[in-house]
From Swiss-Prot:
Probably part of an ABC transporter complex. Responsible for energy coupling to the transport system. ATP 2 binds at G350, H351, N352, G353, A354, G355, K356, T357. This is Putative ABC transporter ATP-binding protein MM_3016. ATP 1 binds at G45, P46, S47, G48, C49, G50, K51, S52. It is an enzyme of class 7 (translocase). Keywords: ATP-binding, Cell membrane, Membrane, Nucleotide-binding, Repeat, Translocase, Transport. Gene3D superfamilies: P-loop containing nucleotide triphosphate hydrolases.
Amino acid sequence: MDQPEDTDALVRFENITYSYPYSDSRVLSDVNLKLEKGEFVLLAGPSGCGKSTLVRCFNRLVPEISGGKLSGRVIIRGKDLREEKVHKLALEVGMVFQNPETQLFSLKVEDDLAFGPENLGLPGKEILSRVEKSLKAIKLEKLKDHFIFTLSGGEKQRTAIGGNLAMEPEILVLDEPTSDLDPSGTREVLDLLRRLNAEKRITLILIEHKLDEVFELADRMLVMDEGKVILDGKPFDILCREEGKLKKLGIHPPQIIEISRLLGFNCRTSSPPYENILKRLAELLMPSTRELQPESRKEAKPKIPPALCPEESLSHVRIEKLSCRREDGSETLKNVNLDIKYGEFLALLGHNGAGKTTLAGHLMRFHKPSSGRILLNGKNISKYSTAQLSQQIGYLFQNPDSQIFMNSVFEEVRFGLKNLKIPEEEMKKRVNSALEMMELSVYRNRHPQALSRGQRQRLAVASILALEPDLLVLDEPTTGQDRGHIHKFLDKIRELNRLGKTVILISHDMELVAEYAERVIVMKQGEVLLDGPAAEVFLSPEELDAAGLIPPLPARLALDLRKQGFDVPGMLTVSELKSFLRAHNVEIRD
Ligand SMILES: Nc1ncnc2c1ncn2[C@@H]1O[C@H](COP(=O)(O)OP(=O)(O)OP(=O)(O)O)[C@@H](O)[C@H]1O
Ligand SMILES: Nc1ncnc2c1ncn2[C@@H]1O[C@H](COP(=O)(O)OP(=O)(O)OP(=O)(O)O)[C@@H](O)[C@H]1O
């Protein structure tokens, strides 16, 4: 980095074109970009469009580590990165990867946060101060001397963010940093990013599928498709003006934009504040007001598909007085009692570290309870091995890489079926249909590690669907996916549920839970805090708040309207809000 070039831009991408090794197809195609110092850039696009590949050019992980062929130049502060070394750039350009496990390599949380500053050669006092500040920012002070391998998914993600914050880089690239965080953790991290950007003028490049949370924070939005930047502008403008194009790419507008448009707001630069939306709704409902006709109320109720299983009332899973004490003495499950019927679609929610994965893991006997028992189809599972249980339970791990180990996409899906000793023809049929369902047929011969994160997640799901188990346990299956793929996948899961399969979905995505789950269980610090129909649970704001959860926007509006005396049902989705308004002859813009 000797001869600075004459330019104001902090980062310039000039005609960047890239192909991975052994592949002729261009993953990045003639990308030209300029980023100014202090910009907060949101990068969006469908799964597999090249977002992660693009951001890895910022510190030359592409092509130095990935291999492959890169043409064009990346210039940071006037200096051509082709003359730079990856390890040096890593100190200037912070990067929070999609999978936190790939960047946590110390034994304990605080050691991991100190690693970067130590490499910068900072004095001991400064290192300590930075570690303290980062711990506070990521709210992990209490876990500072915990071993990394004992952390929950979200706690690991916070640690990975903290490690980067401690380096105080000029440019920080974050590849879906909130994908495993609970809603209040997501808000905290995004708020922290906003502060870093505003106060320290750190340039931020954020890949994020949760647009509701970020579109008002970022100055600029880039949308990619098939290796190209196809839209570049103010997030609000793009989301409002390019809705058709975005929807085709599987990018859905945030609920607040959808609802404000329905209600006739004519916004130019930002969405109206929540209070204005509530006020407009109250005004619109006033004429038909507070006494609802029984018929219309019936129509507005959430449409929950009845499970078709004839044995509906029988317990598929019964969890009795289950407690789990870890080796370090901490109690991660406390007297959990649950009765899950055949054909239920339930969601398991809770703050990071609440015990969701630990509870789900007990179903597979990954952990042994310290007391209590679990009955599956009426039988105590303590008699079964994990291998036997996996023939009845399709279990999707939080991190897809924990369950992918074959050399090709096809073989990966086939692997589980081989263990079931199914005839070859039937096996092929099931593999092909699972790959097609997850839109992975074109990658059938590819090595799974040469897929994007979202594609690997879909591969893990395909492997489980091919087994056709009666009980599906899905631990955050939608991480890293665009809305289009998420809906296709969850529609399929709902179809299976209607055929009688029982579904347990662990998720931090309240909008999806509101749309798909019939029953919602909220956990807090190892205990069940709430358990009931989705509409009821989402209308319990105090308890949800205590568990770090934020109800979806339509549910919040319904609740506040009730407080004002309106007789409204527990609406959970934008389409329920629409039908409710129509039933009251309220004119809406669709
Ligand atoms: N090592 C590799 N070899 C060949 N192709 C690869 C490799 N890694 C990724 N790809 C392909 O490059 C394309 C872009 O991948 P990338 O990870 O950049 O996508 P993405 O937009 O970040 O996706 P996601 O949102 O799912 O993380 C994908 O089609 C993927 O299959
Ligand atoms: N091996 C272990 N030893 C000690 N504590 C552990 C161990 N594994 C997990 N824990 C702790 O148990 C608690 C529950 O973890 P779990 O993974 O079940 O949470 P979770 O609700 O699934 O969280 P997330 O939403 O972050 O994935 C966490 O605080 C975690 O730190």
